[in-house]
């Protein structure tokens, strides 16, 4: 759901301005305002550095199982193209990317949850007929 592999490098570090990067390098910590909470997110230099040791979208991923990626096209935090990139990097042929046009990052609307539930049911019970 709204997959964000490599987010510390591609969605944080690469998009931080020089002031933010310098704050992290100097102080080891940066507070990122968020619309989801009154308190900002705490981003630390160790988080960024650790993320660099776990990058997965630089090579093929040896994952060969059924995969369903759900992503909102109105996600302001993680572009839906990240899910498309992830789908391209796994070796599995059984990959579906489900884009929800009005879906946001949380995909928490009733309609979104119904889509999620249906995908889980299809994966767990592939022989059941759906409506």
Which ranges hold each PLM region?
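Cofactor-binding loop segments of dinucleotide-utilizing enzymes, especially the Rossmann-like FAD-
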Residues: 3, 72-74, 102
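Short alpha-helix in the alpha/beta-hydrolase fold that links the catalytic acid
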Residues: 65, 79-88
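Hydrolase active-site cap/lid region
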Residues: 1-43
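Acidic catalytic loop of the alpha/beta-hydrolase fold
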Residues: 74-78, 105-106
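Catalytic histidine neighborhood in serine/cysteine hydrolases
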Residues: 90-106
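Catalytic active-site module of serine/aspartate enzymes centered on a nucleophile-bearing elbow/loop
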Residues: 103-131
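Short beta-strand/loop motif that positions the catalytic acidic residue
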Residues: 62-63, 69-71, 75
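Active-site nucleophile elbow and catalytic-triad environment of alpha/beta-hydrolase enzymes
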Residues: 40-60, 65
């Amino acid at each position: 759901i709204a997959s964000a592999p490599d987010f510390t490098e591609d969605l944080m570090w690469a998009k931080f301005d020089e002031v933010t990067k310098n704050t992290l390098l100097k102080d080891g910590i940066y507070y990122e305002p968020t619309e989801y909470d009154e308190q900002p997110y705490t981003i630390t230099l160790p988080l960024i550095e650790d993320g660099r040791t776990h990058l997965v979208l630089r090579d093929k991923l040896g994952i060969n199982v059924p995969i369903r990626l759900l992503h909102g096209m109105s996600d302001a935090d993680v572009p839906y193209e990240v899910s498309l990139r992830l789908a391209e990097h796994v070796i599995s042929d059984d990959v579906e990317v489900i884009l929800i046009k009005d879906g946001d990052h949380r995909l928490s609307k009733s309609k979104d949850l119904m889509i999620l539930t249906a995908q889980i049911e299809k994966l767990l019970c592939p022989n059941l007929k759906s409506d």
